[in-house]
Structures are given as C-alpha cells and as structure tokens.
C-alpha cells in the first residue's frame, strides 16, 4: 500500500447556519465488508503514511489541544474530491447545527480544517477530534430529513456515534470514511443549498464516486 498524503494550496471561505428537525431513531446496521478496491487502514499504518510520505504537507493548524492522546495517529485535513474543498468545523453555527462539518474551505488556514485521528485498537476504528473546538465528530442518527446522519464536532468523548472505519483505494489514491453507528459511508452534500451546502453526512451504502471520496493531508508543525 502506498501513501496518499498530498500537498496543499491557498485561501478559505465563510459560513452561515441552518436548523434541522429532530426525531428518527438511529440505524444500527453492522458495517459492511470493505468495498471492492478498498482496504481498511489502521492506526499504525496511518502513522507510517504520515511519516513516510515524501510530498509537501499542510501548514500547522493552531489550536490543537496540548493533551494529544497516545493513540493519536496524526492530525489531518480532509479534502472533498467532489468539490475540491477542505472540510471545516462550523463552530460558530447556532444550535442544533453547532460544529457541523462542511467541505467549504479553499485552503487549510488553521484549526477550522484540522482533525486529530485517534485510533481505538479494541474497535479497530478512529475517532476524529476537531481542532477548532476540541470536540469529537459524531453522526447525528436522531436528526431527521436532510440533516439525518449529518456530522457534527460536538462530543466530549468517543463512543459508537463518534467512531469511523478508514478506507484507502490505492488505484484511485483516495480515502473514505464509514460510520460505526449506521454502517454508511460519509458523503459530501454538493447539491444542498444554504448554510448546509457541502455538509458531510453518513448516508451512502457504498462508495459510488467522488461524493464519498476524500484526499487526506497531514498537518505538521
């Protein structure tokens, strides 16, 4: 398996807000087997990718907690293949969308676009902690409508809601995330409008194309 940690560009974008409806019980589907052409990447493998990659890396993101965990596999930025934008934590959005994740930044400019990937050996999954607000990313399985299964950095601890399997496709040089809560792959909602445009949701049964594919950039410094 070769590394897919890439180099960066420049500039950022802004954001606003929206209010999703609550309701609907979360799905507890067992995560599917690795899709054809994709393989799971564990914590040690991801750490080796970060250390061995020869290409340029993202600039350091300010605001990372000093109490990095021993099982921290690295700090990364997620770039959507669908729209070419980096994922940011909307920490200034009002409830119930505070901390929603959107692929809306043209560049990694700081903590907004940074996420610590924490490997959990017992479950063979990752928890993603936002550097913007020091909260873990959760899948909102109880939200309804277009906001169901949206990703928000809002948790102080990591359980099933906050755990993901990381996949890599060597032929495509792309990454994908699968929620442990509902077994769905994370997709970027390119067709949404308003303040939830480009939001990330765990809603796809499989990796069908660029909607579910991401590039991974290591943040160093």
Predicted regions and their residues:
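Secretory targeting and sorting signals
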Residues: 1-26
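Lectin-like carbohydrate-binding module/patch detector with strong preference for beta-trefoil
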Residues: 27-221
